[in-house]
Design a protein with these regions (language model features):
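Conserved catalytic core of sirtuin-type NAD+-dependent deacylases
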Residues: 1-129
């Protein structure tokens, strides 16, 4: 197994060298990669939680009205996802996967933008909870 040089700086050049010498890298993504595609994240200013209060699990379980509201929010978000297109970040990740520099993408997103950018389904792991 080859030895990957250590990342000693935070420059794009250092990162590019690290990826170039890699054959087993994994990329982790979250909401930030999809904001350029028009999908808001949850915690930043202007994000979902700045516009509405999060629903807590115990409230969801205890109150049918809150469950209804939770599902309404989910369906409203799905409408926004339907029109979203992959952006340059998604395409850059897809290029790394397809050039065999990255083996898998682990994402907290369930927007399918990694798959729509060309990352095969079996190389995307969606972890959201």
């Amino acid at each position: 197994m080859g030895k990957t040089p250590p990342l000693t700086g935070s420059s794009n050049t250092e990162f590019a060298k690290l990826i170039f010498h890699s054959s087993r890298a994994v990329i982790f993504t979250g909401a930030g990669i999809s904001t350029e595609s028009g999908i808001p994240d949850f915690r930043s200013p202007g994000g979902v939680w700045s516009k509405m209060k999060p629903i807590q699990f115990q409230d969801f379980v205890a109150d049918p009205k809150i469950r209804h509201e939770s599902w309404r929010r989910k369906f409203d978000r799905l409408d926004g996802l339907a029109n979203a297109l992959p952006n340059s970040g998604h395409f850059a990740v897809a290029k790394l996967v397809n050039n065999k520099k990255v083996s898998h993408v682990i994402t907290q997103n369930v927007d399918n933008l990694h798959q729509n950018s060309g990352v095969p389904d079996n190389q995307v792991i969606e972890l959201h909870g």
